[in-house]
């Protein structure tokens, strides 16, 4: 297998996993927000339920967040009286517990057949053998990322049924749902770990991870509007506005006023294209941010990609394959030269 074919499969794996995760996550977030809580806030409640008396640093580790991010979420949850903290001998360290109201919020956000929950759309998409294959590959990846602690969390939330009310499902479907939840959590850990690993190497280019993702989308779809960028990226319009403003100020993109009111057509500049190719050569072509994928066989990666593509299609991520092909066409043309 030629190097660019192998790297295409790595590129595909990452983006197929990323877009499947983002589609499920965005749907989950919208569903949860109807109860006046955000998904990250609910996730902290799950973690505390699984590990009563847990510390802030351990919540950050399990949730794949920074400590300042968790600190802000904790403040909000305490103000809502959904959690409380126990003082310890070391007054600088606190242990967090759920209040009765916190437990209630977990219960009302358990998903069932009456809610449009995308994880349910995946029931019947894969056989048990295919589900096990996906789980085994991502388990191997997570172990190499040294995130084994996530397995205990996944096991506990499956035992507690904090995410889904399984009352009206038969035994076979319960097994499939639990495996699907497992995959969702493994995808999340993998994607957020790669994002974290990529953040530091990007500092030399003076861009954030989100700005890099936006540049790739703009490169793949020349003339894209901000609203279209929002849809493909799963970012809010306000987030896209900030990202576009920053990229434009750094001369990495061009903006041209569109016929639609308050809209602009976006194109990547030569400086922006040079940046994404330099980042690819330095951090992705070398597998610097994909170290955990090195020992997975090429055939397993191909097989996994087929399953992840099926997942994206079921979730309605029809642009994913086009995005992968267009971005890798740019990579092949600029980074390989054959």
Region spans (language model):
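Residues within the DNA-recognition helix of helix-turn-helix
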Residues: 73-76, 239, 243-246, 307
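A structural signal for well-ordered alpha-helices, especially hydrophobic packing surfaces
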Residues: 21, 106, 142-146, 191, ...
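Charged, amphipathic alpha-helical coiled-coil/dimerization segments
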Residues: 78-132, 246-302
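N-terminal leader segment of winged-helix/HTH proteins
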Residues: 1-35, 152-205
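Residues within the helices of the helix-turn-helix
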Residues: 57, 75, 94, 227, ...
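N-terminal helix-turn-helix DNA-binding core of bacterial DNA-binding proteins
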Residues: 26-69, 197-236
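C-terminal regulatory/oligomerization modules of transcriptional regulators
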Residues: 1-5, 128-181, 299-338
């Amino acid at each position: 297998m030629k190097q660019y074919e192998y790297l295409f499969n790595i590129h595909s794996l990452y983006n197929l996993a990323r877009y499947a995760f983002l589609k499920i996550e965005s749907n989950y977030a919208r569903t949860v927000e109807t109860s006046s809580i955000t998904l990250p806030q609910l996730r902290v409640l799950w973690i505390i339920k699984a590990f009563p008396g847990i510390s802030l640093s351990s919540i950050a580790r399990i949730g794949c967040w920074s400590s300042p991010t968790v600190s802000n979420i904790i403040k909000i949850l305490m103000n809502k009286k959904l959690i409380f903290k126990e003082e310890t001998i070391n007054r600088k360290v606190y242990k967090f517990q759920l209040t009765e109201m916190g437990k209630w919020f977990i219960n009302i956000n358990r998903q069932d057949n009456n809610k449009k929950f995308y994880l349910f759309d995946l029931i019947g998409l894969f056989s048990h053998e295919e589900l096990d294959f996906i789980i085994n590959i991502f388990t191997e990846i997570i172990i190499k990322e040294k995130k084994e602690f996530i397995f205990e969390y996944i096991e506990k939330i499956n035992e507690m049924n904090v995410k889904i009310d399984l009352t009206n499902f038969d035994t076979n479907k319960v097994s499939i749902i639990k495996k699907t939840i497992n995959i969702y959590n493994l995808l999340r850990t993998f994607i957020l770990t790669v994002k974290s690993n990529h953040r530091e190497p990007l500092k030399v280019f003076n861009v954030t991870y989100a700005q890099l993702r936006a540049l790739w989308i703009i490169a793949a779809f020349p003339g894209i509007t901000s609203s279209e960028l929002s849809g493909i990226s799963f970012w809010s319009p306000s987030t896209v506005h900030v990202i576009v403003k920053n990229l434009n100020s750094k001369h990495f993109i061009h903006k041209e006023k569109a016929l639609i009111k308050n809209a602009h057509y976006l194109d990547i500049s030569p400086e922006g294209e040079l940046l994404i190719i330099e980042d690819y050569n330095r951090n992705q072509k070398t597998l610097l941010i994909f170290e955990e994928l090195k020992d997975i066989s090429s055939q397993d990666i191909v097989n996994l990609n087929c399953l992840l593509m099926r997942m994206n299609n079921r979730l309605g991520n029809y642009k994913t394959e086009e995005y992968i092909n267009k971005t890798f066409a740019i990579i092949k043309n600029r980074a390989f030269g054959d």
